[in-house]
Amino acid sequence: VIKFACNRCPEKLVKVSDMCQGCLAHPCQEVCPKKAISFRNGRSHIDQDLCIKCGRCVTTCPYNAIVKVERPCAKACGVGAIRSDEHGRADIDYNKCVSCGMCLVNCPFGAIVDKGQIFQLIQSIKRGDEVIAIVAPAFVNQFPNMTPAKLREAMKRLGFANTAEVAIGADLCTIDEAHDFLEEVPSKHPFMGTSCCPAWSVMAKKNFPKFADCISMAMTPMVLTARLLKQDHPAARICFVGPCAAKKLEASRHSVRSEVDFVLTFEELMGMFEAKQINFDDLPDDPNDNFNNASADGRGFAVSGGGGAAGG
C-alpha cells in the first residue's frame, strides 16, 4: 500500500442519502434489529454507534435512499487481509494475504501496487541477454484481435529473443497432476486440489491447513514451461507474462528463482507496447511462428474449470 496515495476510505458505512423521501411507512426503521434508525425533520437518520452494518435497511428502502459504502480494496479481498492502520489508511495483513491482486485492481486511487520488474527486464535485454517470453494462454482475451503470430512479432520488436505459450506447461502439469491423483486418491487422500494457481494453493494451505497435503505437488505450468525452454537454452533468461499478480509471489520463491527470472502482468506488457508505439493492426505475422505446440485442453487452463476439464 502506498500510504500517501491511500484515500482512507471508510471501512464499512451505512448512510442515508439525499434521496430519502421521509415516507410514512418507515420500513427502514421497522427492519433495523438494533433500533439505530430514527427520524429527524422528516428524514431517516442512522446512529452509527448502534448500527451493525447488516444492510437490512439498504435492501428494504423503496427509494434506494440508503447506501452501504465499503472500502473497495477490503470488499474485493476474499480472505479478509485488508485492515486500517492508526491513521485510517489501508494496511495489508500478510499473514492472511495470498497475493491474488484483487485489492490492487479494485483500488480507485491506484494506492496498492505490486513489485514491478520492467526496469530489470529492459536492462537485461539491453545487455544482450537471450530473454525468452512465456505467455499465458489468456493473452487472447487481453489483446483484441491478437493472433499468436502477431504476438510473437510484437514481442520480437520489444527485444525478446523468442516467445512461447505456457499452455505447453499446462499440458505437462495435467500429466503430473493426473499421476498424483491416481497414486494418492483415495488411498492416501480423499481428494486432490490443483497446484497450478499460487494464490489458490496458498489460500488453501493458510485457511484449511488440515487439507494442505491434499494439494498436488506438481510444478505449475509457468515453471514447467520455463524448465522445458531452459533444456535447449540453458543461458536464457525467462520472462513470464500473464494476467495475475500472484505469479510474482510464485517467482520469488527460492525453488522457482532459478527457473523464472522476470514476471510481467499483461497491463505492464501493454505499457511497454505503448512506450514503443507498437500498433497491433500494423503488425505482420511472424513467419517463424511455432507458437501452437500445446493442446486445446492446455489452453483451456485459462478458462474457469479448465484445469479440471484437462485432467478429466
Question: What are the residue ranges of the model-derived segments?
Answer:
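Ferredoxin-type iron-sulfur electron-transfer modules and their immediate structural context
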Residues: 1-60, 64-76
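Conserved Radical SAM active-site core
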Residues: 47-48, 53, 63, 72-132, ...
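Immediate flanking context of iron-sulfur cluster ligation sites
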Residues: 11-15, 95-97, 233-241
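Glycine-rich, histidine-containing beta strand-loop boundary motifs that form or position
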Residues: 32, 41-43, 65, 70, ...
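Transmembrane alpha-helical segments of multi-pass membrane transport proteins and ion-pumping complexes
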Residues: 22, 26-31, 60, 106, ...
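Iron-sulfur-associated redox domains of electron-transfer enzymes in respiratory
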Residues: 1, 114-312
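Gly-rich Lys/Arg/Thr-decorated short loops/hinges at beta-loop-alpha junctions or inter-strand turns
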Residues: 7-15, 38-43, 84, 102, ...
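Surface-exposed charge patches
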Residues: 30, 75, 105, 153-157, ...
